[in-house]
């Protein structure tokens, strides 16, 4: 099903998917904001993910469960190479295509279409206009990797893309990397932002975001979600984890909090941590771009942090990294964005993608 969007180069699509994947048994219960604070403490403790403070998961993966989802996406441009964008935690697809006035310089989608690419920009399941799902049993990392795998197939077989690029930001970067590892022959290039390949610096993000139960935080907007969906406490907490002064316009942070920000399920982060990261299976040429002042990926200073990625992406035909861009975590929403987009397109051109 498609409809024409407000942008002439885009159509709104609804993509039905059937996903069969094993699930973890999440044993974290969040009923109210007191529980959200308690979970935050557990996730940021010095002994987190040790026997003294284990992941909130009971046992390993169970049997495969088959589920039907609908993914909402914008399909933009007519280029034979399709870029599939995957957003991060506390975000939506609007991160890649802001809809506020005078924001064209921040729209990766518009820049990519102008550069001759097509873009499949989607809301992850549980987010925005995609299927509402259970925050514990469906909102799990390995399920979302399989959703992206299915979208790669959609790009190739339904949208008839000749080449496919995966572009992931933050949590979406991990999803994109693992999807590229699983669908090696179908992915021609991989671009990662808000990503360092380690969660060593996860605690400042989790504590600084000020997690709150989304349905209590904004009942009119998120009252339909179960209590295991979390969001950030206010625009200033969001700014701390996503932006770096003086390299952004405050209106972009305000818009992100009011419009683009979307909750995440309590099962997503523990299952990311519990999943083996098979970065060594990625064969596609890979570009990693980092705002220097990224809190969650690098603890606030990324210079040197990406140096060890060569030890992880051992099979990538090309691995290029940039660790000192004047920006925070939400790289594309900083004033450096146009130059970042040019860097991405230059890299893809060098790889004949």
Name each region found by the language model.
Residues 292-322, 327:
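Conserved loop-alpha-helix segment in the C-terminal half of the alpha/beta-hydrolase fold
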């Amino acid at each position: 099903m498609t409809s024409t969007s407000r942008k002439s180069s885009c159509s709104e699509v609804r993509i039905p998917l059937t996903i069969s994947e094993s699930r973890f048994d999440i044993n974290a219960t969040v009923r109210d904001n007191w529980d959200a604070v308690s979970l935050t403490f557990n996730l940021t403790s010095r002994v987190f993910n040790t026997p003294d403070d284990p992941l909130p998961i009971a046992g390993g993966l169970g049997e495969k469960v088959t589920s039907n989802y609908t993914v909402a996406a914008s399909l933009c441009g007519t280029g034979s190479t399709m870029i599939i964008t995957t957003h991060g935690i506390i975000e939506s697809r609007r991160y890649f295509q802001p809809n506020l006035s005078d924001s064209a310089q921040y729209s990766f989608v518009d820049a990519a279409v102008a550069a001759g690419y097509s873009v499949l920009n989607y809301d992850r399941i549980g987010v925005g206009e995609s299927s509402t799902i259970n925050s514990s049993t469906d909102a799990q990392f390995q399920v979302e990797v399989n959703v992206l795998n299915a979208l790669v197939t959609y790009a190739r077989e339904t949208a008839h893309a000749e080449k496919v690029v995966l572009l992931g930001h933050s949590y979406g970067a991990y999803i994109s990397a693992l999807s590229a590892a699983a669908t090696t022959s179908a992915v021609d290039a991989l671009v990662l932002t808000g990503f360092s390949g380690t969660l060593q610096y996860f605690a400042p993000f989790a504590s600084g975001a000020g997690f709150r139960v989304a349905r209590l935080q904004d009942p009119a907007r998120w009252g339909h979600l179960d209590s295991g969906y979390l969001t950030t406490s206010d625009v200033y907490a969001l700014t701390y984890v996503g932006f770096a002064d003086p390299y952004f316009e405050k209106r972009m942070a305000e818009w992100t909090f009011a419009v683009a920000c979307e909750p995440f399920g309590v099962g997503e982060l523990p299952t990311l941590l519990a999943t083996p990261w098979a970065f060594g299976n990625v064969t596609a040429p890979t570009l990693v771009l980092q705002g220097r002042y990224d809190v969650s990926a690098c603890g606030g200073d990324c210079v040197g942090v990406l140096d060890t990625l060569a030890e992880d992406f051992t099979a990538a035909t090309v691995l290029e990294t940039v660790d000192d861009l004047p920006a925070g975590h939400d790289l594309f929403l900083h004033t450096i964005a146009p130059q970042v987009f040019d860097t991405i397109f230059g890299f893809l051109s060098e790889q004949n993608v």
